[in-house]
Amino acid sequence: MRGKSAVLLSLIMLIAGFLISFSFQMTKENNKSAAETEEWKKEYALRDELLKQEKENKKFEKELYQKQNKVRQAENKLKKEKSEYYNVLEDTEKYRMYIGEVGVQGEGVEVTLEDASYIPEGENVNSYIVHESHIFQVVNELYISGAAAVAVNGQRLTHDSYIKCNGPVVTVDGVQHPAPFTVSAIGDPDVLLPSLNIAGGLIDQLSMDHISVSAEKEKNVQMKPILKTKE
């Protein structure tokens, strides 16, 4: 009887131990599963947050690109307006210089015309002196060659200036100038001077008219505004 009781007790203890072990294992597994589930939830929430952040960033990037594009368009428009403004200023300054409202200076050339130093006996004196036509020829040649401003004996010329010979003097816009006559021009001397000295050109023609003529480069030709010149 005792043997049966011992066997029964052992069996009960074995079953109890198994149940306890099984319960512990299940509890451990459940805890592990719960922890994994919680970790997965955290990872999912984090991943979802990252996706939302990326979506938000893309939205901001798009807005930034649109604003940058607007800024570039505004800059280009401003550059164009600025360029047009400077072009207008430049054209206005050129026009003011052309009509003689402003004083100008720069490199250029000076052409000096003088009456012939020797007049053969019996020859007509008028054939050996400087006339307005000679001065006109020089002035026109300089303008054609790109002169920005021209003066005769320091007096600025305008688009409607007149030059008239009156005996030994030449009248420019009502102001008389005695010989020699110096025609000054502001412009590229490497263009102006060759245009005068070309073979068979103006200087050769003037020499054939018995006019003493010389042309030289000048580093700094200065001209006053026309209104001040006429004062």
UniProtKB/Swiss-Prot annotation:
The keyword Repeat does not apply. Residues 1-34 form the signal peptide. Residues 44-94 form a coiled coil. GO terms for biological process: cell division; sporulation resulting in formation of a cellular spore. The keyword Cell division applies. Pfam families: DUF881. Keywords: Cell cycle, Cell division, Coiled coil, Signal, Sporulation. Induction: By vancomycin. Belongs to the UPF0749 family. PANTHER family: UPF0749 PROTEIN RV1825, UPF0749 PROTEIN YLXX. May be involved in cell division and sporulation. This is UPF0749 protein YlxW.
